[in-house]
Amino acid sequence: MARRIAAGAAYGGGSVGLIGAATVGLVLAEVQLAKRLVGGGKAPVPPSADGRYGVAFAGPADPLRFVLLGDSTAAGQGVRRAGQTPGALLASGLAAVAERPVDFRNVALPGARSDDLERQVSLVLADPSGTPDLCAIMIGANDVTHRMPATQSVRCLSTAVRRLRTAGAEVVVGTCPDLGTIEPVYQPLRWLARRVSRQLAAAQTIGAVEQGGRTVSLGDLLGPEFEANPRELFGPDNYHPSAEGYATAAMAMLPTLCASLGLWPESDHLDGSRREGMLPVAKAASRAAREAGTEVTGARAPWALLKHRRRRRLPAHTEPVPHEDTGTDSGQGRMRGHGSGATWRRA
């Protein structure tokens, strides 16, 4: 399964399993404790960013349809304004690059693990307005903190990517973030949390790429920057990103989102000076888990392209235009409530 969870030996020798199950259990319990310590009680509902972006680009072409799936990071937990959420940042960035409106819908659920992707994908595919052009998935942190078996986690993600790709959507996965950056987690537990996160991220890369998706590594991108600037890049709960933190993640993912739709000016030409190359997918996944903002895209099996796309500054924070104000009926909705019983209303 996902090359035996990307063979933990790729991260400095030896699998996490060799360290001992008791130690792994201890670090994951410590992360759970850290979440309780920094969360400050029940987290507020993330602002809804559903709607249309780039209305100034309206023309004869239909708007691009973009959906974000995943957990609290995808939902934008920790910020107060819709325009600061990763979905809004990515949708406005897509609109600016494509010079075309983007209809955005977010089905992510705070607290979700990879086994919730089945429900989220079903919501996406049941939309009467049709299959989205592009889906992005940000998932994995809760799988680690709740000790979901990595094989199950990767299987759920792979199935989600396959269903979306079969339906005709492009898919980009932002892999598991670096849990070693949570401030109340101290050494040596911080080191082990980072190790487990990277191992899952590498396995997610293999699973997603083998199903026709692309991945962008978030762990090593956010890790050093969050560690160096925790007050700026973490939100008030010291667990979820701040607006600046979400912007950092969005800047890393936007080039790959655009490239998946043929919108990015760079081709898939490999630049050796940027440490790009064609590698076996397992090796590409291992490198991506260690290198900031690395994209991995499937090539001819068992090979994959490893790229470091140049980033652009994101547009200024943009609030969405509700769909009822655009004169269109997109069939999109906003989620209210938590858990599998969450309901939807028209946007």
What are these regions (language model features)?
Residues A2-L33, T248-A347:
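Conserved catalytic region of serine esterases and O-acyltransferases that act on ester linkages
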Residues A29, L33-A108:
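Serine-esterase "nucleophile elbow" of acetyl-processing enzymes
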Residues L68, I137, V172-V173:
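Structural beta-sheet core signal
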Residues G76, N106-S114, A141-T151, L189-A193:
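Surface-exposed cleft-lining segments at the edges of enzyme active sites
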Residues D115-V154:
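Oxyanion-hole/transition-state-stabilizing segment in secreted/luminal serine hydrolases
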Residues A167-A169:
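A short helix->loop->beta-strand "cap" motif at the edges of active sites that frequently abuts
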Residues I182-S217:
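Substrate-gating cap/lid alpha-helix
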Residues S242:
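Short, conserved phosphate/pyrophosphate- and ester-handling motifs at nucleotide-, phospho-/glycolipid
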